[in-house]
Curated annotation (Swiss-Prot):
It is found in: Cytoplasm. This is Sulfur carrier protein FdhD. One of its GO terms (molecular function) is sulfur carrier activity. Its main location: cytoplasm. The active site is at residue 107. Belongs to the FdhD family. GO terms for biological process: Mo-molybdopterin cofactor biosynthetic process. GO terms for cellular component: cytoplasm. It comes from Staphylococcus aureus (strain MRSA252). It comes from the Bacteria. SUPFAM superfamilies: Cytidine deaminase-like. Keywords: Cytoplasm, Molybdenum cofactor biosynthesis. Pfam families: FdhD-NarQ. Required for formate dehydrogenase (FDH) activity. Acts as a sulfur carrier protein that transfers sulfur from IscS to the molybdenum cofactor prior to its insertion into FDH.
Length: 265
């Protein structure tokens, strides 16, 4: 069962020279502890929606699973904040950490963890998809118009997957990584191949987000914000087209521009 993503709370507002009582929408932070084969794996701070997708996508992003068939069962106990996962295999030595991990909603993992575990799971894109400039602008416009909770609270990241024409999944979360993990989990649950799909994202394209996109397997990532230098380097290395600053009818292509074609061609 999904809990409320946002809740109305009393506040004091200052406007037009006056203080007055009113209500405002706060986004909900929900700690979810993931247990794998009876052992604590991680605690993720997230929005309390689509939690099974989040758990599956998170485990796949971490390299704990590679496909749906490796999952024996996933039980979400949202009343207690636990996800109980049983796998059809052992986790292996590299997941036997001496300390428990908490993945915060606002940031990624340490650089040491990123290089040791993430690089092995990232995929070089073999995507053949091409997009016109108008398709890019239309997809970003649709993402922003579909994000009604963000418009109410200003506190959620939004992400979607598209074939270039329509969205087939759209997810929101307080954590940018979580929003992408929910997309990933959705695809794994349904055995959806994402090689020729587009990731549309509301946040900045950091190196960690680029790596996450590579893990999911997309060939194009679109954002209304700019990428970092390391993200562009990784995008070039992993054959991913990164497009940013999509606003006011324009955008910048930072890597592999061959997938963006003139609409008149």
């Amino acid at each position: 069962m999904n809990k409320d993503v946002s809740l109305g709370q009393p506040i004091v507002r200052y406007e037009d020279g006056k203080l007055f009582n009113t209500t405002d929408q706060y986004v909900t932070e929900f700690p979810l502890t993931i247990m794998v084969n009876g052992e604590e794996f991680a605690t993720v701070i997230c929005s309390p929606t689509n939690l099974e997708e989040l758990v599956i996508g998170f485990l796949a992003s971490e390299g704990a699973i590679l496909k749906r068939d490796e999952l024996k069962s996933v039980l979400i106990d949202d009343s207690k904040g636990f996800a109980h996962v049983e796998l059809n295999k052992d986790l292996g030595d590299r997941f036997q950490y001496s300390t428990k991990r908490m993945i915060a909603s606002c940031c990624g993992k340490s650089r040491e963890f990123y290089f040791q575990n993430d690089a092995a799971v990232a995929k070089t894109s073999m995507s053949k998809i091409t997009l016109t400039p108008q398709q890019i602008i239309n997809m970003m416009t649709r993402l922003q118009s579909a994000s009604h909770i963000y418009q109410e609270t200003g506190g959620l990241h939004n992400a979607a997957l598209s074939d270039g024409l329509t969205f087939f999944v759209h997810r929101q979360d307080i954590g940018r990584h979580n929003a992408l993990d929910k997309l990933y989990g959705f695809c794994i649950q349904r055995h959806i191949t994402v090689r020729d799909k587009v990731l549309i994202f509301s946040g900045r394209i950091s190196s960690e987000i680029l790596i996450k996109a590579a893990k999911i397997g997309v060939g194009v990532i679109l954002s209304k914000s700019a990428p970092t230098t390391l993200a562009v380097t990784l995008a070039n290395d992993l054959n991913i087209t990164a497009v940013g600053f999509i606003r006011n009818g324009g955008f910048n292509i930072y890597s592999h521009p061959e997938r963006i074609i003139d609409s008149e061609q």
